[in-house]
Amino acid sequence: MTHQAPAAHPSASRQPSLPGPTGARAVQAALAFSLAALNLRIAVASLSPVLAEVEHDEHLSSFGAGALSTVPVVCFGAFAFLAPRLTRRFGPHHLLWYALLALAGGIVLRSVPGAPALFGGTLIAGVAIAVGNVLMPQLIKHDFAGRAGLMLGCYSLALSGGAALAAGLVVPLASATGWGWRPVLALWAVPALMAALAWLPELLAPDRRSANRRRPEPVQREGADTAAPGSLWRDRTAWAVTLYMGLQSLGYYAILSWLPTLLRDHGMSDGEAGWMLSFSSFPGMAASFAAPWLQQRLRRAFVPPLAASLLCATGFVGLLTSPVSGAYLWMTALGLGQGLAIGLALGYIVARSPDAHHTGRLSTMAQGIGYLIACLGPLGLGLLHSASGGWSLPVVVLLAVLVAQTVAAFGASRDRHVLASS
């Protein structure tokens, strides 16, 4: 049965609509958007292959290393709630540009010797990415409304591609140059600066300047939805989407932070372990790009999230039984499963919202609460590894999280809008 979306909410129609680019400028805008999205996982993915070296050189404990990996994810959640206020102040296009510049600065700062700079730079980068995370679905809705499915796929693809690029190159670059991890991590500020440069035409275009000067009105106004402001927080579908976002992100960031260390502990070299993390992103890129298409085409909406959970479970079981000998097989399964889950989680935010107004509200809730759940992944895995002295218990816990993720998918995949009366 095809879902008939309700008419656009009055509040949505009263929000200022940013003009969408056309022709050659539409291509330029799409490329600039994708380059910006590419940077939203680089800062996290570039750290994990050299986390052992960072831990040694900065004299961090296992808890400290886990905390360092957790800081960005905490920021993704905590500062997601700040993004709507900043958007009203600066406009979405200018705010993204500022976020990219802040991201570059944070990446450089974390490479300065000393734990304060390391954690401070990581914090700044995390705040910048948090703002970008919330802005991207909003920009898709405003600038690419006619191509939302395609741009959502490009967004998911760019996230996975950035992670693959950073995880795969950081160790070879450090080895080839002999610079060590600090200058090589600082190099990842260059893509952020390139993205900021590519985004400049979006700020300089006359229609963009006028659009960004028009600040959105407050959310609660005459004609807005009659439900109470906090009613979304009492909606089952909204919580299902939020929990699915949080639980799949927990597994993703746990693996992103600790997979190279796990494989090194089982005998892999630093370069091989970093490559395996990068390799897992390639099937993930394809799966995340296909996720919006699968959401729209498959009649049984629960099949894609179930497939994602089964693929992830295959990878986790492989890490328990033969992490090195079957590494390529397990990384393929894990990459496909996590890539599909990421694409589905982002897609649910759009699909379960009746209009742009609710998309913004659900995006803030799902990413804010979701990433606060996700921060338990890197920190929790580090603590479990320290407590147990091995990786079996942490991986078993990730399997248990998969069960909860699958349960959340039942509600998130239902063909129902948030705040629907029935």
Roles of regions detected by a PLM:
Residues 47-48, 236-288:
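Extracytoplasmic gate region of multi-pass secondary transporters
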Residues 301-345:
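C-terminal transmembrane helical hairpin of 12-TM major facilitator-type secondary transporters
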Residues 78-116:
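Conserved MFS/SLC helix-loop-helix module at the cytosolic interface between two early adjacent transmembrane helices
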Residues 45, 73-81, 164, 281-289, ...:
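Residue-level signature of mid-helix packing/kink "hotspots" within the transmembrane helices
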Residues 123-157:
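Cytoplasmic helix-loop-helix junction between adjacent transmembrane helices
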Residues 356-391, 398:
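A late C-terminal transmembrane helix in Major Facilitator Superfamily
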Residues 79-91, 287-300:
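Helix-to-loop junctions at the C-terminal end of transmembrane segments
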Residues 115, 146-147, 154-207:
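Helix-loop-helix hairpin linking two adjacent transmembrane segments in secondary transporters
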